[in-house]
């Protein structure tokens, strides 16, 4: 790829014309790439583990969180200086504090296999490039939402969200073109933003 520079620890994507309003969607693009990378590596190793995305940016394996993603950006009204996407993937962690071990896990604890991080990084880079290209073309998630929704752990299931100091209970329908979660409630559809 001619729009990527390798720096040894990760890929540095050269500047694209992304509006600051759309940059937060890169977190969802990264979540898709991490989910696909973990799924690919585990499948290649013969594991049938359920790896999904918990909206908007957590990766869960067998319903336990194995990865969190954060995005940091420096921008002006119409110009992005930089976007940094950070991911913490629990690859070979062997134990967790009692306070989180019911909800957090690692690829090792879920599969019993020590995995090479380099395989996950390589699979992530390949997946991110694919999803990033689609995102840059549309400047939203229109071309990715079908794939994202198929990766969503609670799509069609009951969810509870706190939004604007109100509890919203309903069924998760998936995301829209902006990455907002659509929840069907008794009062109609509600849009949840991050």
Give residue ranges: language-model regions:
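Catalytic strand-loop-helix junctions within cyclic-nucleotide turnover domains
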Residues: 15-19
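Single conserved hydrophobic/aromatic residue that forms the stacking wall/gate
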Residues: 2-13
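Amphipathic alpha-helical recognition patches that constitute DNA-binding helices
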Residues: 25
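Long, positively charged amphipathic alpha-helical accessory segments at protein N-termini or as interdomain linkers
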Residues: 20, 28-50, 61-194
